[in-house]
């Protein structure tokens, strides 16, 4: 008896998910495999991917265009939260997983499948993100993860697929693993597993090498409403359009590359290369606008929330009660985070050079050191006396 009768497989067209199709049927006795590819703006031609799934043995191959939802329901929330895992990674891949899990569950329920399958290995974070999200949305569905159990190396996986006529775009001599969507690219494996090895220029696609970037800076203006980016250079943009244009503008100046040693949820460290031009600049600009529009105590408290939020997303807990609670707090803080941020792009750097907002808490006649200064300097002495009182009492006590 097989492990499941009908399975919906998260499908990318890559090596692992393609090999999963014959493996599920031949090794695990699955009768029917339905593949589901999510169009997350990865730029691939999806019809060839759909055809590849059918040629690999899928009974049906589906494609879901979820780009708009990906940006509005996932990326924008992360921007409002200034979410950077370990203060560097803007979670482009991690944000896609709960959305993919959601449409997998919806498809399984529609087609009467009894299991969900994915091609994640046992060393990565994605297995956690998929499994936890699926069980949160429908705990009655089984989860099958062939790559977690089959024990094949990447080279052996490629060879297994070739036995069933599955071609691989990955060169056996340099097997980089690449994941791409609208928010960015992640590159790992191969020569990159040596943390001292400088990444070759050939791995990058969304960002130019510094030597190839323009010799003059470019200035852009990003407009926010309620913490959500809505305009670029004064022109209103649809969510997907905004991300696409920013990726092009920012990447053209070599901005958006990340090379980091990352702490994975499964307990190991991994060398990861990311390209995420739009998200990095949007978070940078959004955080700057918050400094203009939020009070000091809210700003400082929210910084701690942001770290927790990024860990929750990274660790696959998008549908957890804590995530829901943090969302409520973050949304409340964003009510007055509206305005425009001016960014200078030049030779791999993005620099905030100006910001403005109708909700600005910056008061020129209190901040100035000029003749228009309205700050009550005499009041400072009494404030300092009260502020420092606990410290003086403590000091007297330990010295007595």
From Swiss-Prot:
Q: Where in the cell is it found?
A: Cytoplasm
Q: What class of enzyme is it?
A: ligase
Query: Which pathway, per its entry?
Result: Amino-acid biosynthesis; L-arginine biosynthesis; L-arginine from L-ornithine and carbamoyl phosphate: step 2/3
Q: Does the keyword Nucleotide-binding apply?
A: yes
Listed Gene3D superfamilies: Argininosuccinate synthetase, chain A, domain 2 (3.90.1260.10), HUPs (3.40.50.620), Single helix bin (1.20.5.470)
Reactions this protein catalyses: L-citrulline + L-aspartate + ATP = 2-(N(omega)-L-arginino)succinate + AMP + diphosphate + H(+)
Q: Identify the residues that bind L-aspartate.
A: 121, 125-126
**Which Gene Ontology cellular component terms are annotated?**
cytoplasm
Spell out the disulfide connections: none
**Location (main, coarse):** cytoplasm
Q: Where does L-citrulline bind?
A: 89, 125, 129, 177, 186, 262, 274
Q: What is this protein called?
A: Argininosuccinate synthase
Organism of origin is Nostoc punctiforme (strain ATCC 29133 / PCC 73102)
In the UniProt record, the gene name given for this protein reads argG
């Amino acid at each position: 008896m097989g492990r499941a009768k009908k399975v919906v497989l998260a499908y990318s067209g890559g090596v692992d998910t393609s090999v999963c199709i014959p493996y599920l049927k031949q090794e695990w006795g699955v009768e029917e495999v339905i593949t589901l590819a999510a169009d997350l703006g990865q730029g691939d031609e999806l019809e060839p991917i759909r055809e590849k799934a059918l040629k690999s043995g899928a009974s049906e191959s589906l494609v879901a265009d979820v780009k708009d939802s990906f940006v509005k329901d996932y990326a924008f929330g992360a921007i409002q939260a200034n979410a950077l895992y370990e203060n560097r990674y803007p979670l482009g891949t991690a944000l896609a997983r709960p959305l993919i899990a959601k449409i997998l569950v919806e498809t399984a329920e529609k087609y009467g499948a009894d299991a969900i399958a994915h091609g994640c290995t046992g060393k990565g974070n994605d297995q956690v993100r998929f499994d936890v999200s699926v069980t949160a949305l429908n705990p009655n569905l089984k989860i099958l993860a062939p790559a977690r159990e089959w024990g094949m190396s990447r080279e052996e996986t490629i060879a297994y697929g070739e036995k069933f006529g599955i071609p691989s775009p990955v060169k056996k001599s340099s097997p980089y693993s690449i994941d791409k969507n609208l928010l960015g690219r992640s590159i790992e494996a191969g020569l990159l597993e040596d943390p001292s090895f400088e990444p070759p220029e050939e791995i990058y696609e969304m960002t130019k090498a510094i030597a190839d970037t323009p010799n003059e800076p470019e200035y852009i203006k990003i407009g926010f409403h309620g913490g959500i980016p809505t305009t670029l250079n004064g022109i209103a943009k649809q969510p997907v359009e905004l991300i696409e244009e920013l990726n092009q503008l920012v990447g053209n100046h070599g901005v958006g590359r990340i090379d980091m040693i990352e702490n994975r949820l499964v307990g190991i460290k991994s060398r990861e290369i990311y390209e995420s031009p739009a998200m990095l600049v949007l978070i940078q600009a959004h955080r700057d606008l918050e400094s203009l529009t939020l009070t000091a105590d809210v700003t400082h408290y929210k910084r701690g929330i942001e770290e927790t939020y990024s860990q929750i997303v990274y660790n696959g807990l998008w549908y957890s009660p804590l995530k829901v609670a943090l969302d409520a707090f973050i949304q409340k803080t964003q009510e007055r985070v509206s305005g425009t941020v001016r960014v200078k792009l030049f030779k791999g750097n993005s620099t905030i050079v100006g910001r403005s907002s109708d909700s600005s808490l910056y008061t020129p006649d209190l901040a100035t050191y000029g003749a228009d200064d309205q700050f009550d300097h005499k009041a400072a002495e009494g404030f300092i006396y009260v502020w420092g009182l606990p410290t003086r009492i403590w000091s007297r006590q330990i010295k007595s």
